[in-house]
From Swiss-Prot:
Biased composition (Basic and acidic residues): 170-184
Biased composition (Polar residues): 351-366
Native organism: Homo sapiens
Record's protein name: Nucleolar protein 4-like
Gene Ontology annotations for the cellular component aspect, listed alphabetically: cytosol; nucleoplasm
Amino acid sequence: MSDSTWMSADPHLASSLSPSQDERMRSPQNLHSQEDDDSSSESGSGNGSSTLNPSTSSSTQGDPAFPEMNGNGAVAPMDFTTAAEDQPINLCDKLPPATALGTASYPSDGCGADGLRSRVKYGVKTTPESPPYSSGSYDSIKTEVSGCPEDLTVGRAPTADDDDDDHDDHEDNDKMNDSEGMDPERLKAFNMFVRLFVDENLDRMVPISKQPKEKIQAIIESCSRQFPEFQERARKRIRTYLKSCRRMKKNGMEMTRPTPPHLTSAMAENILAAACESETRKAAKRMRLEIYQSSQDEPIALDKQHSRDSAAITHSTYSLPASSYSQDPVYANGGLNYSYRGYGALSSNLQPPASLQTGNHSNGPTDLSMKGGASTTSTTPTPTPSSTSTSRPVPTAQLSPTEISAVRQLIAGYRESAAFLLRSADELENLILQQN
């Protein structure tokens, strides 16, 4: 009965030991155990009662069962294994005295060392061994996290650098697999559309970041109007084509821009021509709307300065087509005449439409002068200095400065369209020559 009570009390006593006290208790005993087994057992029995706890040694001096249990190495492990089934956590803290009292080989790697140091061991193992694993995970996280700014810089680099990523030279052209569910002929037409607009409006040797923002935006809007299914890749296509042009220039290749045969076809050329025609009509319509709005904001006044400006426009080699004639009220000599504005001297190469000559019939001297101006322009398609001097006294409908600037923008647009169509014709001719 007393043995069981002391054995049950023993784990609580051993669990009260701190790890530092246990190590101090075990280190001299391990040294004694390496010298000889008899001295270790004697010192273990003596030190076991004295170093475990002073209170326990004083309270157990009269009982002969406790020294026998501590002195005998065979009884202690049996009792401890039975106690280990009851309280495994306290057992691990309690076993160091048993290992100190046991044999010389077992205490160094006993359950006490694993009990007290198992947590420390695993804690220490996680500290020295986890840095390689954690550093590996940190490195992977670092590369993933730092990959974002690095990829962003790579994404920004083509805007500032000429040839940063050489792999996407003709990425949009050659990647027909990306256009699943889309018409490949329209994709070819879209690529040629972008190429032509870039050739006419941008400097091909300048990166997209240094190009005028309004021109880039205008090309993107044109692409979205004519090819709405490819509007997301318009900017990327512009950037890729500019890079390929710079690369060709760097490699000393000819910049005549021959279209590769696999990137064009007759159907794609037809789609391209229809898109260009539609875009030209829409641009002309926008210009006419701007002119009409500006003419309503500022009434037309007869002035010599305006006549000089219109005479300067007369010498332009390009003229407005018949579709540019718009119907708006014209204030001349104080009378309101609702007639076609013929832009008199502007149409130097085109005959005015039949509706223009019939629409000018109104009352008043102003109508006669406007009719005379229209007939003068119809009879003199290419004005010479003599004809200009003779037609100067004839009063014509004048334009405001805002209208003149808008007309000049329209003229520039038609020039670009004409050059664009000329390039398209050259490319078609080259395509026919290449196939034949």
